[in-house]
Amino acid sequence: MAVVRTDLTGGVMTLTLDRPEKLNAFTIEMMQELIDAFDVADADDAVRAVVVTGAGRAFCAGADIFGGTKGFVDVEKRKVGAGTVRDGGGLLTLRIFDGLKPVIAAVNGAAVGVGATMQLPMDMRLASEDPKFGFVFGRRGIVPEACSSWFLPRVVGISKAMEWSTT
């Protein structure tokens, strides 16, 4: 089942995160579909820019932590080197950073966790009138993910990055 809709109109490829019933919560499937779409965009000369947006009332509410327990069941599979994805948001963030086409975030509603961090390597971020950005890692007792500890200070400055990451 596709969780990212793609549309190419007038040289602009629009990627729409399409899980509105879950506020477009991020999954490994979504990560792979986005990476694949960025690969297609880079390979297609008809694509001049990429816009990433969310369906419904949110851009992306962060990682889908309620998506089931199958990732936690087999402890052996979670060991380093066992082929598991540890930071899907980081893989996506680096893919966007390595891209050849300009990327614009069109933010509607909430952009939390990976929903905020995936935007950091994008060239522009445009927001609706009432967006909600959340770098909630400190409140969750986890370290910032998706390469945000590298990108965030470069986008907003070290002082603002520290404030956003720790409060």
Name what the model sees in each region.
Residues 18, 63, 108:
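Histidine-centered beta-alpha loop that forms part of the nucleotide-sugar donor binding/catalytic region
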Residues 94-167:
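Crotonase-fold acyl-CoA enzyme core
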Residues 1-3, 35-39, 89-94, 120, ...:
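A generic local structural motif
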Residues 15, 52, 64, 118-119:
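Hydrophobic/aromatic residues within transmembrane alpha-helices
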Residues 54-98, 111, 141:
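Glycine- (often His-adjacent) and acidic-residue-rich active-site loop
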Residues 3, 21, 25, 32, ...:
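Residues at secondary-structure transition points
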Residues 1-55, 71:
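Conserved CoA-thioester-binding segment of acyl-CoA-metabolizing enzymes
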